[in-house]
């Protein structure tokens, strides 16, 4: 389906929130990663050990360089439990913004985030929104527009599918997470919060193309300032590759990443219809590598999805349909337990050729271990089946 089953993006659950030392951190499944020693933090230790943040500054130099969050859907869903989620963590970061907040959101109905953006705007922070025409009447765009904030809408047939926020030209939030109740409290999602001037410059440049120049999809120029960025982690540096679709030929880069795998490939896919990616995974499976995957069951169409081809591979590939009653919305590939591809980019032709998308490849075993743990959880739920 050309539009990546966009209607399914609106059904989705997440975890719990902890506040300390002026900064809010989301503790979902106790899987929050402080890049200070390279180990996942114990929840209690994490809350007690949060670094002191400069008063009112989202872009403090004391920020941990990378934080990774996962949602934690509960079944059955109870809207009364929709609190202490990713939305509140992001809203707290927005509350600390001093200069600017840019939001590119395919879908946006989180009142807590909309309220935080309006409050920031009223205290002098520049706040801008780019969204898609499919969801221009949702709460987020309506509330911001009513408050006088500038909103740009992509009204093409293809979609502006990004889900990123840039705060103070320093902090980037990006992943599979739509800014919606469902995305936060029902669907399986991930988001990374990365403090990096260079990465923020990349995302700001992409935002400016859409907001100022109205350049969407194939009209967007391939001019990302920093294809590769290094994020300081104490005495070490973490390498991150930064891509935007369709201008950066993202699927080609993913094929290269898969072709370079030496031991294992694991993936979680909301939509997976790209034959090139499927071909490379099947080839690596036949070459003896461990290849495992979980597909969103509602998108495992027998004609278009790669699921059918992988099930029919000889020997049969270890691929499953997800067990989330709502949506398994990840778009993640883990290679050799040391590299992770993540972002808004579904593994489809539409994502690669006409939609606006973003993707990061992070090279770090600690972060890969977190996504591997999330994969194990999603895989286990897939074995148990949908309720």
Predicted regions and their residues:
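Charged, low-complexity intrinsically disordered terminal segments
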Residues: 2-152, 158-159, 166-387
């Amino acid at each position: 389906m050309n539009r990546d089953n966009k209607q399914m993006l609106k059904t989705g659950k997440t975890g719990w929130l902890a506040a300390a030392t002026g900064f809010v951190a989301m503790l979902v499944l106790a899987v929050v990663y402080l890049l200070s020693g390279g180990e996942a933090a114990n929840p209690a230790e994490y809350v007690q050990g949060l670094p002191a943040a400069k008063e009112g500054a989202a872009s403090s130099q004391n920020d941990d360089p990378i934080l990774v969050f996962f949602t934690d859907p509960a079944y059955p869903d109870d809207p009364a439990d929709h609190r202490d989620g990713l939305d509140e963590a992001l809203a707290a970061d927005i509350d600390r913004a001093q200069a600017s907040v840019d939001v590119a959101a395919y879908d946006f109905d989180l009142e807590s985030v909309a309220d935080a953006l309006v409050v920031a705007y009223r205290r002098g922070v520049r706040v801008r929104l780019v969204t898609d025409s499919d969801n221009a009447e949702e709460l987020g765009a309506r509330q911001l527009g009513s408050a006088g904030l500038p909103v740009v809408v992509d009204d093409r047939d293809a979609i502006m599918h990004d889900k990123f926020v840039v705060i103070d030209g320093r902090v980037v939030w990006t992943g599979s997470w739509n800014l919606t109740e469902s995305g936060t409290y029902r669907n399986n999602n991930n988001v990374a919060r990365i403090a990096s001037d260079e990465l923020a410059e990349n995302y700001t440049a992409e935002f400016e193309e859409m907001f100022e120049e109205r350049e969407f999809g194939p009209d967007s120029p391939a001019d990302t300032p920093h294809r590769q960025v290094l994020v300081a982690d104490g005495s070490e540096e973490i390498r991150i590759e930064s891509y935007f679709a369709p201008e950066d030929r993202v699927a080609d880069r993913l094929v290269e990443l898969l072709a370079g795998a030496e031991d294992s490939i694991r993936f979680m896919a909301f939509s997976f219809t790209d034959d090139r990616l499927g071909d490379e995974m099947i080839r690596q499976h036949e070459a003896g590598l461990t290849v495992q995957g979980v597909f969103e069951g509602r998108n495992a169409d027998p004609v278009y999805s790669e699921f059918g081809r992988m099930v029919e591979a000889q020997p049969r590939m270890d691929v499953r349909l997800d067990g989330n009653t709502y949506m398994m919305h990840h778009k993640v590939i883990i290679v050799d337990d040391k590299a992770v591809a993540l972002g808004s980019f579904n593994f489809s032709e539409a994502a690669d050729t006409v939609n606006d998308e973003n993707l990061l490849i992070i090279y770090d075993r600690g972060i890969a271990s977190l996504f591997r743990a999330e994969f194990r959880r999603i895989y286990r739920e897939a074995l148990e089946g949908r309720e």
